[in-house]
Curated annotation (Swiss-Prot):
It comes from the Eukaryota. Residues 84-96 have a biased composition (Basic residues). This is Protein POLR1D, isoform 2. Keywords: Acetylation, Phosphoprotein. GO terms for cellular component: cytosol; nucleoplasm. The gene is POLR1D. The modification N-acetylmethionine is found at M1. It comes from Homo sapiens (Human). InterPro entries: POLR1D-like. Residues 57-83, 110-122 have a biased composition (Basic and acidic residues). The modification Phosphoserine is found at S104. Residues 48-122 are annotated as: Disordered.
Length: 122
């Protein structure tokens, strides 16, 4: 009996708390207070991957530092013989990769072109 009364009392308290929160929400925001946010949620996986891919890789830097520690100072002639190769950005087009020809996207057909092709098929 006591457990039932205790549960009922807690339920009443929770309902009163919720009603007070609803009252303050209605006073401050009105009916819009119960509507969902119109903004879409952020795509956090996309943002994290974009940040990781745009920042220079820490592994490559650590690897280069370790190699530099192992090898003693090189002479100036050896440094000039082995220049570092620059890595191209994966999303930027390099002139070598594109070749000499530049391609344009396909042309949109007008409604007249569509009708002419249909009449030619018949």
């Amino acid at each position: 009996m006591e457990e039932d009364q205790e549960l009922e009392r807690k339920a009443i308290e929770e309902l009163l708390k919720e009603a007070k929160r609803g009252k303050t929400r209605a006073e401050t925001m009105g009916p819009m207070g119960w509507m969902k946010c119109p903004l879409a949620s952020t795509n956090k996986r996309f943002l994290i991957n974009t940040i990781k891919n745009t920042l220079p890789s820490h592994k490559e830097q650590d690897h280069e530092q370790k190699e530099g520690d192992k090898e003693p100072a090189k002479s100036q002639a050896q440094k000039e013989e082995n220049p570092k190769k620059h890595r191209s950005h994966p999303y930027k087009h390099s002139f070598r990769a594109r070749g000499s020809a530049s391609y344009s996207p396909p042309r949109k057909r007008s409604s007249q072109d569509k009708y002419e092709k249909r009449s030619n098929r018949r």
